[in-house]
């Protein structure tokens, strides 16, 4: 368990190298990070980790649900979670329509991804994000 105010972020990305890179960068910034390789795994992780504050998801993934559908479902089931869509295929408008707070276009610099996580964490603290909830090792 982290210190009070520390944010827990779930990274959903089907490509192992990208997922591991994002997890490492976010951990270096002080986030507690969980990881999933697809939407089904992400929903399972969320059901077991109510401390999750932030969802950061890719859009194109194998399985029955893409990242936009995942964000929409999480917005319904866990409206307190702040979501960020990371994609080279979807638009910021599509992300907002699904209920996401933030959007990061691929390809991205890692500092851009980290800044999006910090922005979401700040929104949680200020209750600006419409989908909010004020240490678990990542699973790959």
Where are these regions (language model features)?
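Two-component/phosphorelay signaling modules centered on CheY-like receiver
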Residues: 16-34
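Acidic catalytic/metal-coordinating carboxylates
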Residues: 38, 63-69
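Hydrophobic/aromatic residues positioned on beta-strands within the core alpha/beta folds
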Residues: 83-86
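A Lys-centered signature of the CheY-like receiver
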Residues: 106
């Amino acid at each position: 368990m982290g210190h009070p105010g520390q944010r827990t972020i779930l990274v959903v990305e089907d490509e192992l190298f990208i997922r591991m890179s994002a997890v490492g960068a976010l951990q270096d910034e002080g986030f507690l990070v969980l990881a999933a390789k697809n939407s089904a795994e992400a929903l399972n992780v969320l059901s077991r980790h109510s401390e999750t504050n932030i969802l950061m998801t890719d859009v194109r993934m194998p399985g029955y649900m893409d990242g936009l559908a995942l964000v929409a479902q999480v917005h319904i089931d866990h409206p307190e979670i702040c979501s960020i869509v990371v994609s080279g295929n979807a638009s910021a408008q599509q992300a907002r329509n699904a209920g996401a707070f933030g959007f990061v276009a691929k390809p991205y610099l890692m500092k851009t991804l980290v800044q999006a996580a910090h922005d979401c964490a700040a929104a949680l603290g200020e209750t600006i994000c419409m989908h909010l909830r004020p240490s678990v090792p990542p699973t790959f």
